[in-house]
Amino acid sequence: MNQKSTLLLTGCVLSLLTACSSEAENPACSLEHSVDEVHRVMDAWHRAASVADSSAYFGAMASDESIFIGTDETERWTTSEFKTWSRRYFQRASAWTFVPVTGERHVQTQGDVAWLDEKLDSEHMGRCRGTGILTFDHEANSWKIAHYTLSYAVPNEVADSVLQVIERWNDSK
């Protein structure tokens, strides 16, 4: 190996070693810690909705421009729009309740970005799925939800009949 290659390799190794020199400075540096923190953020977010804590619920969003996509094709909201739409729900004892199915949330991280999919149970909507993207907020030293999509989990065996119901609904409008 020539001197130039050795210097380049040494520089790369040093960069990697110092990039995440302290987990305390940046918890996103520890993969295991990051995954655990994402789980905690998501659990707290779902819990906040179930007790109608709008401050905690919307405080978990990365910004007023973060996106929430609901189950209806018209439901694509920024955080600001979603706050306005859901205000009446957060005035109740519980806005809505989605309970993550144990062992059915899968989280991946890469640097300051995390993505997940999860299965959720709900009394009013049955089994659902959620997918999300979180970003690490260095100022808040925590993960924040940048994008979340909620969808019904429709068994393939009943998909044709569900599609027929949707077609009839669309035709009636």
Language-model segments: what does each one mean?
Residues E81-R127:
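Surface-exposed, charged secondary-structure patches
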Residues C20-A60, D112, V162-K173:
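Short, low-complexity N-terminal intrinsically disordered segments enriched in polar/charged residues
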